[in-house]
């Protein structure tokens, strides 16, 4: 719109045209106020009925809430107005009239259940606190990309339609691909490993992953955003260092650039970036800490994966971001390298928030014979992954990396109760639309 001024830029003494949504109308008799909202904030429009044209007043005060309008008028200081200024209108143009029966209240005065909000996401995003989540999400992704560039990474984009799953199993969405069986990719893992064997060496990707998991919990999605890193000539400890850098950079970017959004969420006083090195516990140390609390029905033993309850217990004990290292080889994927001095212990690691797992990573097996053996030990057919395995015959360097759940990072960063709040249009077992 030509000559439009954002509400945040409206300066006393100027004549401006502002445009946005009708947030609220308050009619006090001889005087009335319309609050107009755009992406930068809100501004008060004052109607003095006895001093204004009747048609102008009628247009401004009879419009439905959430209609899109433009207002042209003089900006004046008004300390009692929500933003300290107000517009005295010369003209009001109704651009798009809203239905009076709204499925939810964007002003937030009437709460709506999450399913209703997700069914009407466009309206839901008109609320300051919801919009703030996605503005913060955008800043997180910007900061993460910048952190990867500081690590001299090249951004890549890998296929999302594949012939075989990354890790086998049944957590795959099958599709028909020109008469062939194909799947939506559950991870860029194998492709990013191939890239570190190329001339690129150190890469990252931010993109969607698809997992046909049966889980239907506040922390699981069937389509999610994965933040992936892989580097040649890195071991698992260097990969953990990179992980710390990226996560801390995400927090620092939000702290520096999203104060208004944090205020909208009521987090301006408590939000802080994690400082220093994240504690690194071995898997065995983690089991000991969990078992020492006595909070589980049965003590954990070597080879057990950590349940949600176990993660919660350990998170309460540690109280900050931390790593779990040296996992049993038997419960880590085939591409994770074992320690040279103990083939029962892998170089795999998880990075945890006190409330849940955020990252899974490790050093990768770069030796062809050992890689094929790992396939066979986990009941997978190496020939089904020939495009991947054959490249390990042509000089594959030692390498390490990890994958970070983007929505989980946002969820834990902002203390959201449900991971679906961190996704514009979530995909889970019950939701395929909108």
Swiss-Prot record:
Family matches, as InterPro entries = Aa-tRNA-synt_II (IPR004364), aa-tRNA-synth_II (IPR006195), aa-tRNA-synth_II/BPL/LPL (IPR045864), Asp-tRNA_synthase_2 (IPR004523), Asp/Asn-tRNA-synth_IIb (IPR002312), NA-bd_OB-fold (IPR012340), NA-bd_OB_tRNA (IPR004365)
Binding-site residues for Mg(2+) 2, renumbered to this chain: 357, 360
Q: Locate the residues binding Mg(2+) 3.
A: 357
Reaction catalysed by this enzyme? tRNA(Asx) + L-aspartate + ATP = L-aspartyl-tRNA(Asx) + AMP + diphosphate
Which positions does UniProt annotate for L-aspartate binding? Answer: 167, 211, 360, 364
Residues the record lists as binding ATP:
211-213, 219-221, 357, 405-408
Instruction: Give the EC number(s) listed in the UniProt record.
Output: 6.1.1.23
- Which GO cellular component terms, listed alphabetically, does the Swiss-Prot or TrEMBL entry include? aminoacyl-tRNA synthetase multienzyme complex; cytosol
Cofactors that this protein relies on: Mg(2+)
Name the keywords, alphabetized: Aminoacyl-tRNA synthetase, ATP-binding, Cytoplasm, Ligase, Magnesium, Metal-binding, Nucleotide-binding, Protein biosynthesis
Q: Where in the cell is it found?
A: Cytoplasm
Which residues does this entry assign to the site Important for tRNA non-discrimination?
A: 82
What are the recorded Gene Ontology BP terms? aspartyl-tRNA aminoacylation
> How is the cofactor bound, as the UniProt entry phrases it?
Binds 3 Mg(2+) cations per subunit. The strongest magnesium site (Mg1) is bound to the beta- and gamma-phosphates of ATP and four water molecules complete its coordination sphere.
| Enzyme class name | ligase
Which stretches does the entry tag as region Aspartate?
189-192
Instruction: Report if keyword Zinc is assigned.
Output: no
Q: Which Pfam families match?
A: tRNA-synt_2, tRNA_anti-codon
Q: Name one GO molecular function term.
A: aspartate-tRNA(Asn) ligase activity
* Family, similarity comment: Belongs to the class-II aminoacyl-tRNA synthetase family. Type 2 subfamily.
Q: Which NCBIfam families match?
A: aspS_nondisc, PRK05159.1
PANTHER family linked: ASPARTATE--TRNA LIGASE, CYTOPLASMIC (PTHR43450:SF1), ASPARTYL-TRNA SYNTHETASE (PTHR43450)
User: What does the protein in this record do?
Assistant: Aspartyl-tRNA synthetase with relaxed tRNA specificity since it is able to aspartylate not only its cognate tRNA(Asp) but also tRNA(Asn). Reaction proceeds in two steps: L-aspartate is first activated by ATP to form Asp-AMP and then transferred to the acceptor end of tRNA(Asp/Asn).
Subunit field text: Homodimer.
Q: What is this protein called?
A: Aspartate--tRNA(Asp/Asn) ligase
Give me the gene this protein comes from. Answer: aspS
């Amino acid at each position: 719109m030509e000559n439009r001024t954002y509400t945040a830029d409206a300066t006393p003494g100027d004549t401006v045209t502002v445009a946005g949504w009708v947030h609220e109308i308050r009619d006090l008799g001889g005087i009335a106020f319309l609050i107009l909202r755009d992406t930068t904030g809100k501004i008060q429009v004052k109607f003095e009925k006895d001093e204004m044209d009747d048609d102008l007043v009628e247009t401004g005060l009879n419009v439905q809430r959430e209609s899109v309008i433009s207002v042209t008028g003089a900006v004046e200081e008004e300390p009692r107005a929500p933003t300290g200024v107000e517009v005295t209108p010369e003209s009001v143009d109704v651009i798009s009239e809203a239905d009076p029966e709204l499925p939810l209240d964007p002003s937030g005065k009437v709460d709506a259940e999450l399913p209703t909000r997700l069914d009407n996401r466009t309206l839901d995003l008109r609320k300051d606190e919801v919009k703030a989540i996605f503005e913060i999400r955008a800043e997180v992704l910007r900061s993460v990309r910048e952190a990867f560039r500081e690590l001299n990474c090249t951004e890549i984009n890998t296929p999302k339609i594949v012939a075989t799953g990354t890790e086998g199993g049944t957590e795959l969405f099958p599709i028909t691909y020109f008469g062939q069986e194909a799947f939506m990719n559950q991870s860029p893992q194998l492709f990013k490993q191939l890239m570190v064997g190329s001339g690129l060496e150190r890469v990252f990707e931010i993109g969607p992953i698809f997992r046909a998991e049966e889980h239907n919990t506040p922390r699981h999605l069937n389509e999610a955003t994965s933040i992936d890193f892989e580097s040649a000539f890195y071991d698992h400890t260097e990969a953990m260092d990179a992980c710390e850098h990226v996560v801390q950079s995400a927090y620092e970017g939000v702290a520096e650039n999203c104060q208004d959004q944090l205020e909208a969420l009521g987090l301006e006083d408590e939000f802080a970036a994690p400082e220093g090195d994240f504690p690194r516990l071995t898997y065995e140390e983690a089991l000991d800490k969990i078992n020492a609390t006595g909070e589980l029905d049965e003590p954990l033993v070597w080879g057990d994966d950590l349940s949600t309850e176990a993660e919660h217990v350990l998170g309460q004990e540690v109280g900050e971001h931390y790593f779990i290292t040296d996992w049993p080889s038997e419960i880590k994927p085939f591409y994770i390298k074992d320690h040279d001095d103990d083939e029962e212990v892998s170089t795999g690691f998880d990075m945890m928030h006190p409330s849940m797992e955020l990252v899974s990573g490790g050093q990768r097996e770069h030796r062809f014979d050992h890689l094929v053996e790992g396939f066979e030990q986990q009941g997978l057919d190496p020939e089904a992954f020939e495009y991947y395995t054959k490249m390990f015959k042509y000089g594959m360097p030692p390498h390490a990396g990890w994958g970070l759940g983007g929505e989980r990072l946002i969820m834990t960063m902002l203390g959201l109760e449900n991971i679906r709040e961190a996704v514009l249009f979530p995909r889970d077992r019950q939701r395929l639309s909108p």
